[in-house]
């Protein structure tokens, strides 16, 4: 990665920062050799998927090992996760035998790059500051052990090649084990998914399912009674969480399902009718299934809101409140509620009062900021020179995957077609592509069949794609928080990454925030950005939550917020964070409206 950063530095794209970008044909030197792929076929799809054409990536239905199953009833004191899962018999967890083929499908092999678990800088997380506030904060764990974790979960964690807990996992495991609610802010890429899956599954493996009410109708009218419900703002993130859940529920009695809009509801209904113990869902589709009477929340022990600030920013608050407050959800105090996100400004914390009880507030790392594992470069490039500058960047990069962000769906298609014509293996993901096309594009990118992914905001938030070594902001966003989330797609789980941004006079609204981000992360600030900042109007960075300042990760109860007072322990080592941002919308499957989001409709 250091070599790639040096190559970018030596590209002569900014020989003189004040003069801006110098096109290759004016530099007095030949164009760099480009990455060729003679096996690429641009007919009927290829790596780009043809925007509706054929593709060699099959659209397999989600599910995989352990999701076949029968309807999970409470028959004779036993519970089974289908033919391939474990069983809960007379108060005891009986794991299924190990299956070599299933383990390869779920966990890969050690040298498989698609199953990246940790990077060369993972030990650096030991030095990340942590602030845990609330009553009687449990001591954090320092390693994966039993107790407090269940033995079967430990085996699955070992299969996934996780060797040590991240800071958020060190705290979340004992917090959940002690029956407490949790609001957690953690640096992007720092293991938030494991932060809620590990403790929730561990406790579920120990305590088993709740008894289900007797069926009120025929088999096809039965409801699913999940023990855990995880809500996420987008179908891509929901699918990603589900894929992780399949790994860690391996051989257990817990059957995981995922539901989201944009895909036929029939397949999802059939999976749910076979039994569902852990449900991952987007708010719109979950509301739809509740209205259809296919799901009951009466047995929910664990409610998880992932990217909670984003869901509220996207206008999902009415849906979430309906799910939590108006349906048959287990009430506050009788369930455990966990809220996870990269940012939690004060207004979201105030809303959390309605969903959490006696919770512990956890801030890990420089939340809402950029990882120091990411080397950031800002280049001055006029719009007409961007394609040429991009080719130079790509020619300097030979290893890993590159994620390129643009602002519009039209530009995503145009740039992808341009890159394909230059013999790069590129694909695109944006809102006009169908769900199956998006899944095929992501599968191609994850596997390395396509080394370039051109994306609108779809891939900007929450997705964990291994081996992304370079993020290029071809078009800078208007909000600095979106910039942070975009570049957070690299440098994840302790790995190093490079982020390059094309900047010009049209990006004046992000000048101050970008300067602040670079300075905060000890990155080089180019002179043209300093000059632009001096001339930019106003004094506050453009952030949709800028009104709450830079310290929005703080527990508002410490600052005299509602319910403040009487809060004892605090393991504080740092404070200084930023707010979130929002865009997108959920599925059209529900009658619930969308009130938030940005002008970019790329989610759909």
From Swiss-Prot:
**Which residues does this entry mark as bearing N-acetylalanine?**
2
Motif stretch (DEAD box): 306-309
Top-level EC class: hydrolase
Q: Where does the Helicase ATP-binding domain start and stop, copy by copy?
A: 173-362
Give the Dimethylated arginine positions (modified residues).
Answer: 62
Q: Which UniProt keywords apply?
A: Acetylation, ATP-binding, Cytoplasm, Helicase, Hydrolase, Initiation factor, Isopeptide bond, Methylation, Nucleotide-binding, Phosphoprotein, Protein biosynthesis, RNA-binding, Ubl conjugation
User: Glycyl lysine isopeptide (Lys-Gly) (interchain with G-Cter in ubiquitin) cross-link located where?
Assistant: 158
Binding of ATP, residues: 186-193
Q: Which Pfam families match?
A: DEAD, Helicase_C
Reaction it catalyzes: ATP + H2O = ADP + phosphate + H(+)
- Which residue stretches does the UniProt record annotate as biased composition, category Polar residues? 1-19
Q: Where is this motif: Q motif?
A: 142-170
Q: In UniProt terms, what function does this protein have?
A: ATP-binding RNA helicase involved in translation initiation. Remodels RNA in response to ADP and ATP concentrations by facilitating disruption, but also formation of RNA duplexes.
Q: What is this protein called?
A: ATP-dependent RNA helicase DED1
